[in-house]
Amino acid sequence: MKKLLPLIVSLALSGVTTAHADDLAQIYNQAKENDPQLLRSKADRDASFEAIASSRGTLLPQINLTAGYNITRNIDTHDNHQPSSAISENNNFTAGVDFSQELYRRDSWVNLDIAEQNARQQDSAYAAEQQNIILRVSQAYFGVLQAQDSLTFIRAEKKAVGRQLEQTKQRFDVGLSAITDVHDAQAQYDSVLADEIIGENNVTNSYEELREITGQMNKDLAQLDTKRFSANRPQTNSNALVDEAQQKNLSLLTARIAQDIAKSNISLANSGYTPSLTLDAGYQYSDVDDHTTRGNYKSNDYNVGVNLIVPLYQGGTTTADVKTAEYQYVSASQQLESTYRGVVKNVRAYYNNINASIGTIRAYEQSVISAKSALEATEAGYEVGTRTIVDVLDSTRRLYDANRQLSDARYNYILSVLQLKLAVGTLSEQDVLDINAGLKTASTSK
C-alpha cells in the first residue's frame, strides 16, 4: 500500500491541476493587471490629462506672497582696530503681494489646445493598447497550445516509430527483414527524438512569452475543444470592413490627432510674431526700526500697470521655428497616409487569411483521414512484403505532419479573426469571452 501512495497522490494532483487549468479569460485578466506596456500607456494617458491643467494654469492669475526680516549691524573701528562708539543697527521687515494676469498671449492659448490634443492622442493610444493586449495575450496563449500540440504529436510519432523499430528488429532476428530496415527505422526514431527535444524547448519558451505579459508563470492552460470548433467566414465583405476601419481603427485615429497636433505647432511657432500684454500689480509693506537714531518708519507701496511686449527681431529663431513646424506637419501627414495604407492592407490581408484558413482546415482534416488510411495500407503491404519499412516510416511521418498542420491551421484561423477585428477597430473583451467559450472546461476535458 505504501508503494501505491505516491502514484495515488500524483493522480490526485493531476486531476486537480486539470480542473484548475487557466483559461484565456483568466490569463487576459492577469495581463490587464500586470502587463507593463498597458500600464505604461495608462500612465502616459493620465499624465497627459494632468498636463491640460498645467497649461491652463498659465492663463489664470499668478499671485505670490513675499516676506522678509533683515537685521543690519555696522561697527566702525579705529586704526588700532579697536571698536569705537559709532555703532549702527536697524531691523527691517518687509512683506508684499504680487499679482500678474496675462491679458493676451497667443502661445499660451495654443499650448492649451496642444495639451488637449495630446490628451486625446494618449487616450486613443491607450484604447489601442487595450485592444492590442487582447491580441498579444491570445497569440501567447495559443502559442503555448500550439507548441503543446506539436509536442504531443511528436511523442505519439515517437511511440509509433519505436513500435515499428521493435517489430523490425524482431523481423530481422527471424530473418524476415534486412539489416538496412533496422537502420532506417533507427534513423527515423533518432530523428523523432531530436524533434522531441526541440518541441520541449518550444513549449518552455512559449510559456516564457506568456509570462512576459502576465508576470506570472502559468503551468496549465485550458485546451481548445476541437469537437466544438467551427470556422466561419466573415459576414461582411472586405470593402465594407475597410470603410469601417477608416472610422474605428484606433491607430488611424491616433495618427489623425498627431497630424492635428503638428498643425497646431505651426500656430504655436507663428505666435512668436505676436505681441503679449500682461497686467501686473503689487503691494509692498516695509517696517524699518533704526536703533541708532531711535527712528522708526513704515511704508506702503502700491503698483499697478500693463506691460506690452512686441517681438521685433529674435535673430531668425521664430522664422526657423515656423519652417520646422511646417516640415513636421508634412511628416505627420505622410505618417497618417502610411498608417492608412497599412490599415487597408491589414484588413484585406487578414480577411483573406480567414478565408484561406477555412479552406486549409478542411483540406488538412481530409489529409489526416487520408494519411491514416495510407498508413494502414502501407503497414499491411509491409506485412506481406509489397512495401518497405521506409514506406511505412514515410507514411507515419505524413500522418503526424498532417495532424500538426491541422492543429496549426485552427490556431491560425482564431488569430486571423482577432487580427482582422483589431485592424477594423472592433476588437473587444467580448471576443475573449467568445473564444474562451470554445475551450475545454473541467467537465468537457473528462
Give, region by region, the residue ranges found by the protein language model.
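Periplasmic alpha-helical coiled-coil/stalk elements that build and connect Gram-negative outer-membrane
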Residues: 2-3, 132-244, 353, 357, ...
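Acidic, low-complexity, intrinsically disordered peripheral segments
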Residues: 20, 405-446
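Amphipathic alpha-helical coiled-coil segments
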Residues: 40-55, 129, 133-153, 163, ...
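Gram-negative bacterial Sec-dependent N-terminal signal peptides
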Residues: 1-20
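Bacterial Sec-pathway N-terminal export signals of envelope proteins
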Residues: 8, 19-68, 74, 217-218, ...
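Small/polar, glycine/serine/threonine/aspartate-rich low-complexity segments that form flexible
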Residues: 66-101, 224-235, 267, 280-321, ...
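Transmembrane beta-barrel architecture of outer-membrane proteins
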Residues: 26, 92-96, 139, 184, ...
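A glycine-/polar-enriched beta->alpha junction
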Residues: 29-39, 46-61, 96-114, 124-131, ...
